[in-house]
Curated annotation (Swiss-Prot):
Coiled-coil regions listed in the entry: none
Encoding gene, per UniProt annotation: rplT
Keyword rRNA-binding: yes
Native source organism of the sequence: Acidithiobacillus ferrooxidans (strain ATCC 23270 / DSM 14882 / CIP 104768 / NCIMB 8455) (Ferrobacillus ferrooxidans (strain ATCC 23270))
GO BP terms, alphabetized: ribosomal large subunit assembly; translation
Keywords: Ribonucleoprotein, Ribosomal protein, RNA-binding, rRNA-binding
GO molecular function, one term: rRNA binding
Protein name: Large ribosomal subunit protein bL20
CDD domains from the UniProt entry: Ribosomal_L20 (cd07026)
Keyword Secreted included in the entry's annotation: no
Length: 119
């Protein structure tokens, strides 16, 4: 049976890992064994944080909507309930953007909501 020399594949694999570790500090970028551990840890953080990002942004949108709604004299929960009753189907991302960028439009939305809540 012939002998298999794996220097080329090992070098390619090491090169790939070290390329992913580019920008890391200290031996984490230049020592293969340490870089491999750092890259594996980075990948787990990456996977976890893609999911966390969705929760974080939803929380941010809710905080922004609540702040804008309270400045108009209505709480977040009553505002969202009023939107539901009025049949206005805007998601939290769009509502937060309107609250930040277009105060007049958000005020008109609040007026519609107050009308629904009073009825």
């Amino acid at each position: 049976m012939s002998r298999v020399k794996r220097g080329v594949t090992a070098h390619a694999r090491h090169k790939k890992v070290l390329a992913r570790a580019k920008g890391f500090r200290g031996q984490r970028k230049s020592n293969y064994r340490i870089a491999h551990q750092a890259v594996m840890k980075a990948l787990t953080y990456e996977y976890r944080d893609r999911r966390t990002k969705k929760r974080d942004f939803r929380s941010l949108w809710i905080v922004r909507i609540n702040a804008a709604a309270r400045s108009e004299g209505v709480t977040y929960s009553r505002f969202m309930n009023g939107l539901l009753r009025a049949g206005i189907q805007l998601d939290r991302k769009v509502l937060a953007d309107i609250a930040v960028r277009d105060k007049a439009a958000f005020s008109r939305l609040v007026e519609v909501v107050k009308g629904q809540l009073a009825a």
